[in-house]
Amino acid sequence: MGGISIWQLLIIALIVVLLFGTKKLRSLGGDLGGAVKGFKNAMSSEEDKKALEDAEAAKPVQTAQTAQPTQQATEKKPESNKEQA
């Protein structure tokens, strides 16, 4: 009671085939399958893109090394004897 039996489903399927024809149903099925395949490809490419972004974010960021000031070597002039005398 209240449920759909197998006979009712077969009658509905027969009416649909008579209304649309087998060629139209076959093309609709192919279109539907292509849409589902495209949706799955888009979802997997988004997941791959997200995983790639996460991997790039996990990499340590290389910072520019600051240049340390270097002391120039200057030769110390020998003191002349004038100052000592």
From Swiss-Prot:
Domain of life of the source: Bacteria
Keyword GTP-binding: no
MF annotations from Gene Ontology: protein transmembrane transporter activity
Subcellular location: Cell inner membrane
GO annotation, biological process: protein transport by the Tat complex
Chain spans, region Disordered: 43-85
Presence of the UniProt keyword Transmembrane in the record: yes
Compositionally biased tracts (Low complexity): 58-73
Gene Ontology CC terms, in alphabetical order: TAT protein transport complex
Transmembrane spans: 1-21
Keywords per UniProt: Cell inner membrane, Cell membrane, Membrane, Protein transport, Translocation, Transmembrane, Transmembrane helix, Transport
Topology in membrane: Single-pass membrane protein
Ranges of Basic and acidic residues composition bias in the record: 46-57, 74-85
Entry-linked InterPro entries: TatA/B/E, TatA/E
Pfam family, one: TatA_B_E
Subunit structure, as described in the record: The Tat system comprises two distinct complexes: a TatABC complex, containing multiple copies of TatA, TatB and TatC subunits, and a separate TatA complex, containing only TatA subunits. Substrates initially bind to the TatABC complex, which probably triggers association of the separate TatA complex to form the active translocon.
Role of this protein: Part of the twin-arginine translocation (Tat) system that transports large folded proteins containing a characteristic twin-arginine motif in their signal peptide across membranes. TatA could form the protein-conducting channel of the Tat system.
UniProt xrefs under HAMAP family: TatA_E
Family per record: Belongs to the TatA/E family.
Identification of the protein by name: Sec-independent protein translocase protein TatA
Gene label: tatA
